[in-house]
Amino acid sequence: MWLNAETELLYPVRFNGKQRVVYLKGEAYFDVSKNKEMPFIVQMEDDVAVRVYGTEFNVNTYDGVETVLVTGSVSMNQGGKEVLLKPNQKGIFDKSKDGIKVEDVDVLPYVAWKDGDFIFRNESLGSIMDKLSRWYGLDVFYQNGDLRDVHLSGNLKRYKDVQELFRSFEKISDARFKVKGNTVFISKL
């Protein structure tokens, strides 16, 4: 199991009973062995749970709840409704519709963080900066709100100096980044 930045995982010292239940807030990647007698369950906010049948998967609760299945099989459960995911699918709990939506995805951008990479595929600068602010402990201010909607693509190392990342972004966008302490100011060129 791998835990991303700003993640909390609660689990018992020893799993007793008929289930292995953990409680997650944040993002984690799991590689779980199959055990029919004691299934593994990841419990999250809004009474959403992932039941695992021996698999590798990523769970993210930073902004809502989503599960991306790499291999094996999992089901997402909420309010008595269960949706089975196949490899290369993402399940998203939609609180407004009180349901789970499933879509096919390229899993790499969702799981690259565990190997020390950021992979962005036509992702909004707002979403990218949310990830970077968690990882680097930054506050982000946009001098022009439209910049949040600029879309970027690229592969970057998570352990690079943040200034290097911003220089890379400046080469491929109209955004400019100025860092003062732990605060990033983003403006238009």
What residue spans do the PLM features occupy?
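A residue-level detector for the "anchor" residue at the start of short, highly conserved motifs
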Residues: 1-189
